[in-house]
Amino acid sequence: QRQMCIRDRKIMSRNIPFRYDFVGSFLRPEKLKEARAAFQRGELDGKQLKSVEDECITELVAEQKKAGYHVITDGEFRRATWHLDFMWAFDGVGHSKTNTGLPFHGEQAMIDDTYLTGKVGVSSVHPFVEHFKFVKQFEDENTVAKQTIPAPAQFLEQMILPFAAENTAKYYSDNEELVKDIAAGYKKVIADLYAAGCRNLQLDDCSWGMLVDPMAKMFFDTDDEGLLKVQELFVRINNLAIEGVPEDMMVATHVCRGNFHSTYASSGAYNDVAKVLFEQENVDAYYLEFDDERSGGFEPLAHVNGDKKVVLGLITTKKPELEDKQAVIARIHEAAKY
């Protein structure tokens, strides 16, 4: 029985990404939001908060299975943000309450400022490994657990954008050493995730969304030539971090433009990054947003090379209206041309 289950899971993992899939993050249930607020007020301790998280994640996984998905995730329910919690667990990274926030379309996301406090590294088992193990226990012959983490490029971007550059320079005289240290940290986390049974890893990467935004030159304080260099730096750190990943671990990149209170952080088609991102990044698949006009057309998909797969993000989470089924089918056929 156990051998059959292991074999079935191996077959399942070869099918990643699946014909219908989801990114991985879900809206927090009310009881989780209440528990987190109580924890921040000192009314709950860490163990009590974890108990509520466990309960909410168990219920979420049951819903994912009930809906017929082959992927299960923890909904990122244990995180304050989709990306920064991961960074906070690295050596040499600090955070504090923000005074300015992160700009989204129409509002500021008041999430912690995150910055270097020393050399970057991972000297112990990353908390996300234990988070993954909790979801892994719910795998069965029909499902594979997916772990989402921010891409190495996202981590690097956090530390080299103009607002962070001066602080980062206190610890790194150039980006090369920083790239190597971040990549080395990721290699350890990925190896530990693999040892815990992870075969489905997703790198969430908003850095490419920033690069295609009309304001990209301002974001990175550079010109067109400089933006191309940033692209090459980002794809290099991503490739360095996943270099040598075992063949049976599927690695995908999810290119995101942000989602906070159903609004976005950046806009722009994939045209300007397609050549570098789709031709040079050594991943197995891409999860790409195409849920509204901000994402542009499907033409850049012509640059996706080799055996890489593409998951089309055609169903939006930013508005409650359900998409027209025939319109979605038509868009799939349109994308298939490229």
What are these regions (language model features)?
Residues I11-Y338:
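Domain-level signal for soluble alpha/beta catalytic cores
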Residues Q1-I6:
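Short, small-residue-biased leader/transition segments that mark boundaries at the very start
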